[in-house]
């Protein structure tokens, strides 16, 4: 009976990951050059978001540039930035993979950065990463600091995720390891099918381990950044860093829609501050709203404090923290699902547009 219950919990966790999966395709130099020319021809005169260097949007776990080549991961965001004068590209990396190593997302992103630079003639890029995409962006900033002007992370688990710890612990109840293998195979196939390029470089177990709190601590040792606060603290670090003579501007923000409430018999309740209780349409039209409320409640009962359903406030702190008060869950941060969000949630498209202007005014 207990094993059956644990299996259901694991299945639920996987289903949750599928329901909240955000979407990204590596583009050839010729295609990028054509796109760059088209954007330059249509950029508005005022150039509110016209940064000096190109912006690359970097997706997180389970992502791609467009799910199945149709639904944008950064829903409506690339188009809005382009309409306001920005030169914007969207990376397409493995949806399920670690960030370091030869097959990792970091090396994939580095190759894409070089492709964008070759297509545009720029010398640097501004990296904007959501969720795991922030860790991937930090990798590139660490190993190729001369190619990066700024790193912005949105809802990134710099200290890992308590929900990843929870899933790993549940899987560990199976002494045979069969559950992990079967579920990982299923998730890997999901990653291949939803990738716009049907990328076969998928490793769900490596991705899960990357996002645990223990592995995040190791990652931070291997790829340190001045933007990180002291280990174990709920503090951010410096707003800039200089690596090999190259200065990077560092920014972050996050949603904290899931807030702890009262504790009864050792169990802490939670509330979703982004929605109107019972009547909010987001609960009906966006299945990820309730799913992330559930995962966020699990996190709170594992000591995370306020969170977005997958990443805690403390874990998301990095560089100059612009806000941790947005009433967003993890998908609201990228305007998912399909632009539906709770009645109290701010507009993420406007927030990212404003940040592009901030980068412009900072000279990058």
UniProtKB/Swiss-Prot annotation:
| Assigned protein family | Belongs to the AB hydrolase superfamily. Pseudomonas lipase family.
Q: Name one GO molecular function term.
A: triacylglycerol lipase activity
Q: Which cofactor does it need?
A: Ca(2+)
Quote the record's cofactor note.
Answer: Binds 1 Ca(2+) ion per subunit.
Keyword field: Calcium, Disulfide bond, Hydrolase, Lipid degradation, Lipid metabolism, Metal-binding, Secreted, Signal
Residue span(s) of domain AB hydrolase-1: 54-333
Please give the catalytic activity noted in the UniProt record: a triacylglycerol + H2O = a diacylglycerol + a fatty acid + H(+)
Q: What is this protein called?
A: Triacylglycerol lipase
Encoding gene (name): lip
* Function text: Catalyzes the hydrolysis of triacylglycerol.
Give the UniProt record's GO annotations in the biological process aspect. lipid catabolic process
Q: Which residues form the active site?
A: 131, 308, 330
> Listed disulfide bonds for this chain?
234-314
**How does this protein assemble?**
Monomer.
Record the organism.
Pseudomonas sp. (strain KWI-56)
């Amino acid at each position: 009976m207990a094993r059956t219950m644990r299996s259901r919990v694991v299945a639920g966790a996987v289903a949750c990951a599928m329901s909240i999966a955000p979407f990204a395709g590596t583009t050839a130099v010729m295609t990028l050059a054509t796109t760059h020319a088209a954007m330059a021809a249509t950029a508005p005169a005022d150039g509110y978001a016209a940064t000096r260097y190109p912006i690359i949007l970097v997706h997180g776990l389970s992502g791609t540039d467009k799910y199945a080549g149709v639904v944008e991961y950064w829903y409506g965001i690339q188009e809005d930035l382009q309409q306001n004068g920005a030169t914007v590209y969207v990376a397409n990396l493995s949806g399920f993979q670690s960030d370091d190593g030869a097959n990792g997302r970091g090396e994939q992103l580095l190759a894409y950065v070089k492709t964008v630079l070759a297509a545009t003639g720029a010398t640097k890029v501004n990296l904007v990463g959501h969720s795991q995409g922030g860790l991937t962006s930090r990798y590139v900033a660490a190993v190729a600091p001369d190619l990066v002007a700024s790193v912005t992370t949105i809802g990134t688990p710099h200290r890992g995720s308590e929900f990843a710890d929870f899933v790993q612990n549940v899987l560990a109840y199976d002494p045979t390891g069969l559950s992990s293998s079967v579920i990982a195979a299923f998730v890997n196939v999901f990653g291949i099918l939803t990738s716009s390029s049907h990328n076969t470089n998928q490793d769900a177990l490596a991705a899960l381990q990357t996002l645990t709190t223990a592995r995040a601590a190791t990652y931070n040792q291997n790829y340190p950044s001045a933007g990180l606060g002291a280990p174990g603290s709920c503090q951010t670090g410096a707003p800039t860093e200089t690596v090999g003579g190259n200065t990077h501007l560092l920014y972050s923000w996050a949603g904290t829609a899931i807030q702890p409430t009262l504790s009864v018999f050792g169990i802490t309740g939670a509330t979703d501050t982004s929605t109107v209780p019972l009547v909010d349409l987001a609960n009906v039209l966006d299945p990820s709203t309730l799913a992330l409320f559930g995962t966020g409640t699990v996190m709170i009962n594992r000591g995370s404090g306020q969170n977005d359903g997958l990443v805690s406030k403390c874990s998301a702190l990095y560089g100059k923290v612009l806000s941790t008060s947005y009433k967003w869950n993890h998908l609201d941060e990228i305007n998912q699902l399909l632009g539906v969000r709770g009645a109290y949630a701010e507009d993420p498209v406007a927030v990212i547009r404003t940040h592009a202007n901030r980068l412009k005014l900072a000279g990058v």
